[in-house]
């Protein structure tokens, strides 16, 4: 019987392959979608903005591998950051969403690391907790 949960690394590889299928946006298309989101709260426009920047999230998240946390979790937190960036992005300021989003993605990942990472690792199962 197959396991209902696929192998983690295979899942991450598949996710990284899937995000490559989303097209990158031109400056004009990005501005048009950002204005549609800002003015009419068009969720389709926001979805296209988020999905077109998932590669940026993965790139930034993989740079935080050295903390011993799962890369999939770092990417998930980065995805929260890109959603926050799209929500707050002002296209009239004259810069690209990727420039603005980079700061929100990093902030979300760093907050997750601070909440999750510890120099002293605490036992997670009963056998590890009995050790001390």
Language-model segments: which ranges?
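Alpha-helical promoter-recognition and RNA polymerase-docking modules of transcription initiation factors
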Residues: 2-132
